[in-house]
Amino acid sequence: MTPFRFRAVPALLAALLAAPVAAQPSRTSSRPDGENPAAAFAASHSPATSGRHRTSEEEDARRDHAETHRRGFQQHDRPQFVFSSKENRFSFSLGGFVALRAAYDAGGIVENIDFVTYDIPVAGNYATRQKLTLDASTSRLFLKAIANTRAVGRVVIYLDGDFRGGAANSYTPRLHSAYVSLLGLTLGRDVTTFCDLEAAPATVDFQGPNAYNFNFATLVRYERSFAEGRLSFGVAAEMPVVSGTYGEGFDAIPQRVPDIPFYLQYAWGGDRSSHIRASAVVRNMYLHDLTRKSDTSLTGWGVQFSGTIRCCDPLRLFMNGVYGKGITPYIQDLTGSGLDFTPCPRDETRIRTMPMWGWQAAAQIALTPRLFLSGGYSTVRVQRSHGFYAADEYKRGQYVFGNVFYTIAPRCKVAGEYLYGSRRDMAAGKGHANRVNVMLQYGF
């Protein structure tokens, strides 16, 4: 990071053009974004990497932003530039990256920019054999501000977004996160509390393994760690998103009760880079019964076990397993599928939540500090509940991937990936797809 004071803002463009490329710092972990924040700060901001004297305020500002940097699935690198006020009472950073993905589907396609196995056509035809895709809509911008206050200590304000807000290829801006964090509280929009950000490996595919749950929610969350960072827990109230099949006997109405996800995590290792986590979520979904002319509700619930384990210096493992009823927002492949609940096939005046489960496991090996390989398998299944509502209802999806990432320069990387997926319906219809992805990404 190359910090500046507010008074130096007019010289920012000149500094950007004149700044030399720093040597890539050595890693202490096989995870591409898994460095200890304090160690990474010391390595990348030592006097040897600086061309000018830095004040204590600037050092403190960089440390604040390093310590609050979040690592994990689809997270950005630490910012290159940090702006600080006098005595570091307030600082902010700007950053992001430009990402270009190219994909080619053959032997079956996915009707989505991302590799979503739910969207694999079951009855293939001449239009579902091959497809070319070029996409830069996941390029990202972010702003982080940190205030060091006497009353409540450190306050973090964060916003980020990409260009996936409209139809495919429209490049409409989309807000990902917008929250303020203080005293263990997070208020705003962020990744759902049910998601374990470090339980999935890096993928070129923006969607990631189909049993994972990288979704966002508007929330109020409380988190706390203790026992020297070995133990942590979190609980939240999140705005519910219901996706059900109502049939002829029911109708949608506004929701009244937030989803309640919570977790307990145990971490180990010198930098706490390995952990296991147990999570759960409870939901209460409201709908209107047209037959009885009254409102009713269904209870959804889910449990998850997840984690990441650094087995040795170059090898890291990832996994998560989830089971529940009526939890489509918390399983990647089922989000928006209409399977939180469906009418009973024998009596459409009755309705029930759908049981569902999924799991994924992956490994990542760092061949050098700049080069790593990943591979894994993921599957999702929707169980029958007294039969099935429709013959073309989703039953099972499989997601297999292998990739290679190479860091050309500290903020530039390229990657290649192969993906195989399949979808099976309740009535045994099946489709499959193959995709080759390549990516070029440059951060700033």
Predicted ranges, named:
Residues 139-159, 263-290, 366, 371-378, ...:
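Surface-exposed extracellular loop regions of Gram-negative outer-membrane beta-barrel proteins
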Residues 83-114, 125-243, 256-257, 261, ...:
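Outer membrane beta-barrel
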Residues 10-19:
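Bacterial N-terminal signal peptides
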Residues 105, 148, 162-168, 194-196, ...:
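Sequence/structural signature of outer-membrane beta-barrel proteins
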Residues 21-108:
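N-terminal periplasmic/intermembrane-space "pro-region" immediately following the signal or transit peptide
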Residues 406-408, 432-444:
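Outer-membrane beta-barrel "beta-signal"
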Residues 271-387, 391-394:
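Detector for outer-membrane/organellar transmembrane beta-barrel domains
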